[in-house]
Regions:
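Non-globular, low-confidence helical/coil segments that flank catalytic cores
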Residues: 1-155
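Solvent-exposed, low-complexity, repeat-rich "mucin-like" stalks and linkers
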Residues: 155-188
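Serine/threonine-rich, repeat-prone extracellular segments and beta-strand-based repeat modules
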Residues: 189-220
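Pro/Thr/Ser/Gly-rich low-complexity, intrinsically disordered linker/stalk tracts
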Residues: 231-255, 293, 310-351, 409-420
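Hydrophobic core positions of the immunoglobulin-like beta-sandwich fold
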Residues: 238, 288-289, 376, 386-387
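Extracellular low-complexity, O-glycosylation-prone stalks/linkers
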Residues: 255-277, 351-374
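Short S/T/G- and acidic-enriched coil/turn segments that sit immediately N-terminal to beta-strands
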Residues: 282-286, 380-384
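Beta-strand-rich modules
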Residues: 290-308, 389-407
Length: 420
């Protein structure tokens, strides 16, 4: 109306309109283009608020956000009739609206609002209402918002959907595991043609991921879930027995924490069970020492993954340790008696495990008093010269072999004396 007085408002200015309060959030003075100069108003009533953004473009939205402007509101009147150049994702996140109103004429439905804007709103779970369908009415009463209008749903975000898998726990099998998928959004099953599936970390033991991405036809956004892959059943591959030592090797797996080995003289592992833990996936063999000789043992191994679980025990194998390598009984082969010495010679031990010999001599036939013991630590040396001591003429002697596992039996006792 001509002659009507007017003035430009400034940031922070507010005035009352009945029960509502109108506040200037942005006065438009910082803009350099017509749209950037759009005034942004917040209307507050009944404890709820509506943000009116005019034709404010994303360029100015971002500038104002960077300067700390507060655009928080319950309802957003989408900028520039839903043009793609307005209502950027960062701006929508800053407003945090529950509802959005898009004002555009019925004649422009083919052009506005843009699909990109509708997708951005859907990704933030904002309910959209459009004036192209019907005049939009919102009631702000006592801190509650109501509307007789129906939501205009073109895109639905699947982020908060529920993914059902054929199973949540699998065992590794050396190849990718791809459980079947079902997606439910807002209580309805979504057709598999509406999203694509991507599996990751789904081969080796650990936590595998499933990511569904809407194909932007009706559904947008992503929805994720996980499932567990336990280690596979282990296999003992190599085994070696040497005396009372047993060396085992197993197949091994990738991406496990390590392995458990159990062994026992009980086939059922109900008693006398011992365990070894290997906290390295590359530790694929071990040697168990100090076992009983000539004894059967049972072995099984399994992999484990910390915070995930254990694999199945391998097939039990049995191995028997070798017999105790007892040196043969000592036997003198030659005794040469001289005045000041006596040369002793005995049969050599033949076992590769034998370490040497022990000779004892004493004037006491029962070897209880004045016993002297000589240890020879070379199995190849099978002789010894016994030297005469003052006032000692006769000796009783005996010899035996020994190794690191045990001693042989003493030879028959021989009586020797120094020649006159």
């Amino acid at each position: 109306e001509k002659g009507c007085p007017y003035r430009n408002p400034i940031d922070g200015e507010s005035w009352k309109l009945g029960d509502a309060t109108v506040t200037v959030v942005y006065d438009g003075f910082q803009g350099t283009t017509y749209n950037e100069c759009s005034i942004v108003l917040r209307v507050t009533c009944g404890g709820k608020s509506l943000l009116l953004t005019g034709d404010l473009p994303s360029t100015m939205e971002k500038q104002l956000l960077a300067k700390g402007y507060n655009f928080k509101a319950d309802v957003l009147k989408v900028g520039h009739h839903g043009a793609g150049s307005s209502s950027c994702t960062a701006f929508i996140k800053a407003v945090q609206p529950q509802y959005a109103i898009i004002s555009s004429s019925r004649a422009s439905t083919a052009r506005l609002p843009r699909a990109s804007v509708l997708k951005r709103l859907a990704l933030q779970f904002v309910k959209v209402y459009r004036t192209t369908d019907k005049d939009v009415v919102f009631n702000f009463i006592d801190g509650k918002i109501s509307t007789p209008n129906k939501e205009s749903i073109k895109y639905t975000c699947i982020k908060n959907g529920t993914i059902a898998l054929s199973s949540k726990v699998f065992r590794s099998k050396g190849k990718a595991i791809t459980p079947s998928v079902s997606l439910v959004v807002n209580g309805k099953v979504v057709s598999p043609s509406e999203y694509k599936i991507k599996y990751s970390s789904n081969k080796n033991p650990g936590v595998a991921k499933v990511k569904l991405t809407g194909l932007d036809k009706k559904f947008v956004g992503t929805c994720t879930t996980t499932f567990m892959i336990l280690p596979k059943k282990e296999t003992i591959k190599t085994k070696t027995v040497k005396l009372n030592k047993i060396k085992l090797g197993w197949e091994g797996q990738k991406n496990v924490t390590g392995y458990y080995l159990k062994y026992s003289t009980s086939k059922s592992f109900k008693k006398n069970v011992k365990y070894k833990i290997f906290n390295n996936e590359k530790n694929l063999n071990t040697t168990i020492k100090g076992l009983s000789f000539n004894k059967k043992y049972y072995f099984s191994v399994r992999a484990f993954k910390s915070n995930i679980g254990d694999g199945k025990w391998s097939k039990t194998i049995s191995l028997k340790t070798e017999k105790l390598p007892i040196p043969t009984k000592g036997f003198f082969t030659e005794i040469i008696e001289k005045t000041k010495s006596i040369k002793l010679q005995w049969k050599k031990q033949s076992s590769k495990y034998d370490a040497g010999y022990m000779i004892q001599y004493s004037p006491d036939k029962k070897f209880k008093d004045d016993v002297e013991t000589v240890t020879i630590k070379k199995v190849s040396k099978n002789s010894f010269k016994l030297k005469k001591k003052p006032k000692t003429k006769d000796y009783y002697i005996r010899v035996k072999g020994y190794n690191k596992y045990c001693n042989g039996k003493w030879s028959k006792v021989k009586k020797v004396k120094f020649a006159d």
